[in-house]
Amino acid sequence: MARYVFITGGVVSSLGKGIAAAALGALLQARGYRVRLRKLDPYLNVDPGTMSPTQHGEVFVTDDGAETDLDLGHYERFTGRSATKTDNITTGRIYKNIIDKERRGDYLGATVQVIPHVTNEIKDFVTEGNKDYDFVICEIGGTVGDIEAMPFMEAIRQLGNDLPRGTAVYVHLTLMPYIPAAGELKTKPTQHSVKELQALGIHPDILLVRADREIPEAERRKLSLFCNVRPSAVIQALDVANIYDVPMAYHKEGLDDEVLAAFGIEPAPKPRLDQWEEVCNRIRTPEGEVTIAIVGKYTGLKDAYKSLIEALHHGGIANRVKVKLEWIESEVFEKEDPAPYLEKVHGILVPGGFGERGSEGKIHAARFARERKVPYFGICFGMQMAVIEAARNLADVPDASSTEFGPAKEPVVGLMTEWVKGNELQKRTAAGDLGGTMRLGAYKAALKKGTKISEIYGSTDISERHRHRYEVNIDYKDRLESCGLVFSGMSPDGVLPETIEYPDHPWFIGVQYHPELKSRPLDPHPLFASFIEAATEQSRLV
């Protein structure tokens, strides 16, 4: 029988509910429990696929092709369990499901209302498909008091009564700010947040209190008294140097013990955290440092590249080096020489993106890396720009471009209109909807034997996650390969180019997929481990 942990947030947003949920999942998993993590997002979008990266941050793609919240990336990285499309739902998706049912007549003429129809839809989502799990951790997006979150709060309140007694625990993550003028940590914001939650009928079992310094015992007792929780259930969540310290920090504070106690479970056996200790030790005691330039177009919000950042750090963990990131807005290179920005870095990474803005800057970055023999990693759009650069400057195709930017004389990159997913032929047109219509999720690729990328993977058959609607035009393959660019990986049917590389370059690889989505701190992705290894070698030359 599954037990449910509901994690809510108060006082301010961005406190780290996703990290808290992921860390708790890792701790329970380290005790041998089977854990599932789910995210409930209050916004009205059906999914984040069409949302601006500078507003929402990264769109995390699952193996089964769902475009989801970036917190699912944290869940995967901390637990190693691959998320699915059934692990994330939004208000938009819920209302769409309900409206579809109403149009079909499923409600038999009833007046469709928030209670019970919306709340029932939420409850069904939370409780379905959990028979193989010991714990289901549900993170509620937003902050207590947000009008958008009200149906979710009501649904989890009802679940407290619907589920068997003792199978639901509520954890409230809140902030205890330090006021320099008073020289004190203040409990009042947390008190008011809990009162707001209690007014909704939810009484938290555990308070997880964010603070930038130790919380005095007297303040903990005060929170216990006014928030109606046991003293042992007031758990401080102090700032840490890196997010991979969080599981051990929370274990030290007793979060997992307290959660188990709230369920009436003896907190044994102790979690096996030796792998986490090794990861954190490597982060704390690096044997070197490399600088990686990320030439992107959404650098104003680092969360737009969340999985990418983490995957680079995983590569650092694998090589026992610290990875320093230099963020460069790609449009800069459309006006300025890239050399002053790039000549001191040890590796260049051009990530995914959409649209013409900044594309020429990415092409200049790819040319610099190719000519100067600097390790280059092009992901999705970054691979496409590297191919356009090769077409223009090596294959004598000066008008090489992408149809994503408009009509092109030489469409080296073009819209995919047909591809195979499983046994089904997928078809798209330029006039179709944007949402959910890309090549999404895990696809297999066949790597050419003897290439660098096949050696890195240790295999010629791979599966990686995709999120794109444009693809390198195979009609230019022979012309480009005659100039030294190797198409080292193709879709199994030989139609879609998946990876490229230069054999005469120390490390120049482009991939059409997103390998960062499958990297873990306990299991770094081989491409990122190899890229950072190459950057480490480059650091000895610069």
UniProtKB/Swiss-Prot annotation:
Region span, Amidoligase domain: 1-265
EC number(s) from the headed UniProt entry: 6.3.4.2
Binding sites annotated in the UniProt record for Mg(2+): D71, E139
Function: Catalyzes the ATP-dependent amination of UTP to CTP with either L-glutamine or ammonia as the source of nitrogen. Regulates intracellular CTP levels through interactions with the four ribonucleotide triphosphates.
Organism of provenance: Rhizobium etli (strain CIAT 652)
Pfam families in UniProt: CTP_synth_N (PF06418), GATase (PF00117)
Any one GO molecular function term: identical protein binding
Binding site residues for ATP: S14, L15, G16, K17, G18, I19, D71
Name of this chain's protein: CTP synthase
UniProt-annotated binding residues for UTP: S13, K186, T187, K188, P189, T190, Q191, K222
